[in-house]
Amino acid sequence: MMTSPAPPQGFEPHFRRSPLTEPWEPIYSQRTNDRVIIGLYARDTHTNSRGMVHGGLIAALADNAMGLSCVQVLTAAGRKPEGGLVTVSMAIDFIGAAKLGQWVAFDTQYVKTGRTLCFAQAFVTADGDVIARADAKFRVT
């Protein structure tokens, strides 16, 4: 098993754990008023049979980063969703690959909130190079 180095400055152990992401730990995050950036070092448990980070992991953590970023924006605007958010739709374009040992970051670059919906876009990078772009729509509950 590969040991992960310390995360980049500003990142701490991810505050939101779930049974889905438990096997992918350690996962880190960085919070601001308008977004949550999630990151991890690519390990064997993150990869497909070709040694690249699996698209399912990329999609799941992009969804997580965008949803949490929507909550950050809504909360900063005094509209913290009591019931959280539910993903309505999500599209992802895979334009590169992450390999073992790379720092993979899920950074939400755009959030627009409405009364019942929140729209977000995220970019996924591997050591700073864009490998995926995701768009999602969330229902505010």
Question: Predicted regions: what is each one?
Answer:
Residues 1-141:
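Terminal targeting signals and extreme-terminal segments of soluble enzymes
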